[in-house]
Amino acid sequence: MAVGKNKGLSKGGKKGGKKKVVDPFSRKDWYDVKAPNMFQTRQIGKTLVNRTQGQRIASDYLKGRVFEVSLADLQKDIDPERSFRKFRLIAEDVQDRNVLCNFHGMDLTTDKYRSMVKKWQTLIEAIVEAKTVDGYLLRVFCIGFTSKDQQSQRKTCYAQQSQVRKIRARMTDIITNEVSGADLKQLVNKLALDSIAKDIEKSCQRIYPLHDVYIRKVKVLKKPRFDVSKLLELHGDGGGKTTEAVVSAEGAVIDRPEGYEPPVQEAV
């Protein structure tokens, strides 16, 4: 065994030296996530992405991101009937530091969905595929439960199979007519107000009384070819550049874009 000093470690070689700590957030940028103008809340949050370097474009990594937001947050409403609905928005384009999103689906929260399933009643579900006027192919899931008659002394409220088939056919007809007769913006407004489920519940009362009728889930199966102008129409003024009024030293009002930073002066 050789006795002596290890020159590599004493001089601070490759193995013994300290690694330079680099903050990973120093090469990332924050982008504002914008919802379409069919919702009251336009800015739903911020997202983080690596800064553009060479052929790695930041906007390419932002497109396709899906954001899940509660309807109560989108509509600035504390109504409990809105809090259990979740809307999915997908990033389709990037304008400056704004990520423009479009509708990508809807779902109910797990706790709400499981709380509706109970004993002594019949669960009726319908799955419908329909296309909107502007070319979006959607798969809509509807759910409903039979309701007990107040005058009845029976513990259960089971429906016959013939009644279940009639109710499911009525659900399919109403959903197909509502989806095929509206564009995506009108359909999202109907989903937010839950008007389709209310029409189904009212229409099926003659067959068998129902309660807890909801559009449980909406999936976007196919979209039309991407058009920037249509996306900008959905966002209106909120998707583009936002300006703020600034009063100069002379008293004139100057409109500056959001996030404006004055240039660095070389000499004072």
From Swiss-Prot:
Keywords: Cytoplasm, Developmental protein, Differentiation, Oogenesis, Ribonucleoprotein, Ribosomal protein. Component of the small ribosomal subunit. Mature ribosomes consist of a small (40S) and a large (60S) subunit. The 40S subunit contains about 33 different proteins and 1 molecule of RNA (18S). The 60S subunit contains about 49 different proteins and 3 molecules of RNA (28S, 5.8S and 5S). The lineage of its organism: Eukaryota, Metazoa, Ecdysozoa, Arthropoda, Hexapoda. HAMAP family: Ribosomal_eS1_euk. It comes from Drosophila virilis. This is Small ribosomal subunit protein eS1. Belongs to the eukaryotic ribosomal protein eS1 family. It is found in: Cytoplasm. It comes from the Eukaryota. Pfam families: Ribosomal_S3Ae. Its main location: cytoplasm. GO terms for cellular component: cytosolic small ribosomal subunit. SMART domains: Ribosomal_S3Ae. The keyword Nuclease does not apply. GO terms for biological process: oogenesis; translation. Essential for oogenesis; required for late follicle cell development. One of its GO terms (molecular function) is structural constituent of ribosome. Residues 1-21 are annotated as: Disordered.
